[in-house]
């Protein structure tokens, strides 16, 4: 029986193995069965692999299933095991599903319970904490109310202990780390400074700037050489007056930094040497590069110097200057010019050499600043301005006189400069209450240089106390006070006087001034401000226009009749003077020289006739002219900007920072006003006020502020009004510009022009338009004049002396790369002299636009406000309203034409002439107006395409002079000058002023002819000798 059970168990096991193997085989092979194969019972239990499927379609017929009783035990066991496995899998899946649902439900319940528990815990903690705080405050209040004194004592002890612990912690923990970090930071900054590109070089010669050096000592011997301890030269310093009664030594900071053992040396033959270590710092700035030092007692006497006055940055003006240096032959003075600002530095045109640092720039006897170095990128030197330190470099109770030509720095730049000396300003405020030990300033005592005046009333009876004028007086300390101040000065604390220590006399003057002003205000009603008055002037001038077009308008090609102004100009016809007729009658050879010339016609009819003739020729040339492509124009614009690069300048101060402000505008306005030609005509419509010249407005204290307001109003309108689509009349009616007066120039004309009626017309702009142009362009134009040797434009040179002629020829020789003798003798091998006929009328609108692009590219700090103002100015000058002498207004239809009386005419004409040469293929060119010298060959056909009528001269001719030698240039218009001389004056009238003017003109003409002694002698006998015997009153 036992053996049967064992056999049955073994049989079941083997059957189970076979079943598992067959099932696995079926699972592996079932994926390879054809899709159309039918399932047959017993197929899963076959162990042999199925044969490859046939290509043909097979049809199987399933047999009827056999009864279970006919199956073998193996098949039955396999079926039982498969059934068991299937049931087990189903039960397992069901159990797994139930378990998953139970887990998810349990997890959700646990999460909800946890959130609830945390919330209850936090609220419980909040209640506990608030209860503790409430209990603490209650306990603290109970302690304070019942034990007040002990509690406050404990609080005080706790505070003291806390800060003691912090102090000890800082001393033994934070302080060493702080010292190490500071040292590391200094090393890092030093390394960065050594690696970085310097902002300025120490010395530089300015390209194109002509300076001169003359033997001259500094004012008051106030410039002091600084040397190394070894005696080698290191730089310069200067002795200046301070407003606290002291004298200070001023030098450049980098001189002291580079020379730690510097010594001040007397330059007056004395052997005194004072180490600068004996001096103590008053004010210092590394970035500002100015250091003020307080010296030991009587240091000025030991060095043999006196103190000079200074101008601070707030009042620094663009002006002429001089800089002093000491060479082996003594002191010399070099010419310089203050031209603008660069950040907190001042741009200076000057020639300097090694060792000039620290030397002051002077205007007259006043120090303007300290030489700092040269710009690393720009064509100019840099001067460190003197900061305005109340009580030191500027007064605390009076205002310094405003610089006559406007300030160099805008208000924001001045604030930045003063910020460099913030520590000094702080010490100034702390020392305002200083009073000398004696109780009285030495300046309030008698001074050797004071001059006193006495009236007759002072001579009778008791003599009254003498009072001296107190204007701009600086108090001087007694030498003992100076010594005590120097001895107790640690180099940081500076004793500075303030307004509280004002002298009694000055306080009395101030009080009387306030009282007098109060009296005036009580008697005289308030006057209108200049702004209000300027508004009334604008309305008055606008009322003069009549914009109604007459029924029979005057027709001019390129212009339309648009209105009328009252007639203010009545030009008189010039006639040949009786003096000239007498001279020609006595000297027939003089008549031969002056034949072929005559005076033109004057008046509106002559103006209209000439205008029609020239305008028709202008339109004819303009129609045949071709405008270059955009690429060609850009090429010439960039090339022009490159050759004019030495004349890069700052834009107007008026729009610095992108905004037009009154204070900055006044900087430019003052400079513009003082550079005007005072005797020039004021033009339309301002002539209606009855003052015909600039002088009448500029020198009138009441009209000058109004003129400033009128100019400022115009600039504001140019910024605010949409001018882009306005015509000439609209520009005038909207107050963006004034009409341009047209008149015939009062100079002799050739007979051919007189017969044709082609007179030379002048288009003169108004005073306000002049000022607007000067505000926008004066920096650039003046820089071009100063640096004419470095750029193609030559408006700044002259040919009145042999030295000037040689100077120009040397510049020309450098341009062509040869010697002066060679370029004059064989000029055809190097250049072509050309002249353009009717140049002003040939200037097209696109040429003016390209010239403005070059101007903008040469402006360092160009901003949208400056660009818009210049664009509006260009729109107005290209689309003008001309006014004849009888008041007829003619609006320009086609834009263009250079206006001969504009402030920019000389500068722009020269540059446009150079650009025209570049358009025709010239490699280089130099021009003065319409005259030009350019590289070979000149392409006249290309000029004609541009609309110019250009002719080549057969001689080396430039600016109406023919060059015969490097220092010899003969005028071309000799006969024209003589005609104007003899027929334009009438010294026979006996008027002293007429005779004086005639003789001055004679000597000017004779100077032009100086290289022909025989001609000069002959003309002298003809023109001068008959006048000399006359007695001229006042001589």
Swiss-Prot record:
One of its GO terms (cellular component) is membrane. GO terms for biological process: DNA-templated transcription; proteolysis; viral RNA genome replication; viral translational frameshifting. Specific enzymatic cleavages in vivo yield mature proteins. The protease probably cleaves itself and releases the RdRp (Potential). Cleavages have been shown in the P1 protein, but since the N-terminus containing the serine protease is shared between P1 and P1-P2, cleavages should also occur within the P1-P2 protein. The record marks 203-204, 400-401 as: Cleavage. Residues 829-944 form the RdRp catalytic domain. GO terms for molecular function: nucleotide binding; RNA binding; RNA-directed RNA polymerase activity; serine-type endopeptidase activity. The active site is at 254 (for protease activity), 289 (for protease activity), 357 (for protease activity). Keywords: Hydrolase, Membrane, Multifunctional enzyme, Nucleotide-binding, Nucleotidyltransferase, Protease, RNA-directed RNA polymerase, Serine protease, Signal, Transferase, Transmembrane, Transmembrane helix, Viral RNA replication. Precursor from which the RNA-dependent RNA polymerase (RdRp) is probably released. RNA-dependent RNA polymerase plays an essential role in virus replication (Potential). This is Protein P1-P2. It comes from Turnip yellows virus (isolate FL-1) (TuYV).
